[in-house]
Amino acid sequence: MLDTLLIDATPRWLIGQAVAFLALALCIAGFANKDDNKLLLILIAANVAFAAQFALLGSWVSAGITCIVITRIVLARRYHRNLFIMAALLAATIGVTIVGWQDWKDAPASIAGILGTVGMFAFRGSIMRWWLFVAAFFWVLSNVAIGSLGGILAESLVMTTNIITIWRIEMDKRRLALQAD
């Protein structure tokens, strides 16, 4: 990544970095919000910024999959466990990967897209968040591969937030179980 920072500091690269930090700010605003509807709207805006960032940094598979992620956020909430829609989004993710494949740097975004789709459509609660945690890890790898500082920080924030939320969900389950006894 250091070689990217030193060699690729073109105006397009700098704008890509700025857009990534905008996405980071939107992620922070989204996860700080207690209203799920506002969270989803802010996450959609963050993913629009991520798609632009990936395009500016020349990662077309990541940009395409991020556009699919935007669609997934909207559909997963309304059509949870709908296997047809999940399969269509998985096929779109694989299709974008095949059409746009440039090199190994495209693999983490593809894996992240697949894991996130399965997680959001097949699960809820802690299990869904574990899937999203692993998907975020692959988004971190994708951002490392293209040298996106804001993207690395944003996805690391997503991972940290997911771990904290998983812990809180599990603690609530334990409290409820103790109260039931």
Language model: regions and residue ranges:
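Alpha-helical membrane-protein topology signature
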Residues: 2-181
